[in-house]
Amino acid sequence: MERTFIAIKPDGVQRGLVGEILQRFERRGFKLVGLKLMQVSEALAQKHYAEHKERPFFGGLVAFITSSPVVAVVLEGKGVVATARAMMGVTNPLNSPLGTIRGDYGIDIGRNIIHGSDSLESAEREIALWFAPAELLEWQATLGSWVYE
């Protein structure tokens, strides 16, 4: 079964949106297999955003993600990478439709509430970066037959 990495960023944590965001994914039928509240180190932030290292906004990304706690999440389910991205909306909240997480709660591109892996390859890399294997729980959800054919 497919897995993805989600980070509820400092603005989402500070605004008390963690429960609402997790609820959306659970109601969609995705299973939580990893969940932790953490203070992101500068080293982890730099590794996570390494692809943006040469961009002018890199320092701001690192400063923001390390400024306050983040909720790191691993979700599992059929098509979870693409579906989670659709549920989040586009990067700029002002261009995200209402009904998406960013469309409903975001105001500014620099405070867009949530990060989600953009591909299976990114998901694997990000999950390995943010979680030790022992932090991911293998468990059987009984709702599977009610969600998938």
Curated annotation (Swiss-Prot):
It catalyses: a 2'-deoxyribonucleoside 5'-diphosphate + ATP = a 2'-deoxyribonucleoside 5'-triphosphate + ADP; a ribonucleoside 5'-diphosphate + ATP = a ribonucleoside 5'-triphosphate + ADP. GO terms for molecular function: ATP binding; metal ion binding; nucleoside diphosphate kinase activity. This is Nucleoside diphosphate kinase. Disulfide bonds: none annotated. Its EC number is 2.7.4.6. SUPFAM superfamilies: Nucleoside diphosphate kinase, NDK. Homotetramer. PANTHER family: NUCLEOSIDE DIPHOSPHATE KINASE. One of its GO terms (biological process) is GTP biosynthetic process. Major role in the synthesis of nucleoside triphosphates other than ATP. The ATP gamma phosphate is transferred to the NDP beta phosphate via a ping-pong mechanism, using a phosphorylated active-site intermediate. Gene3D superfamilies: Nucleoside diphosphate kinase-like domain (3.30.70.141). Belongs to the NDK family.
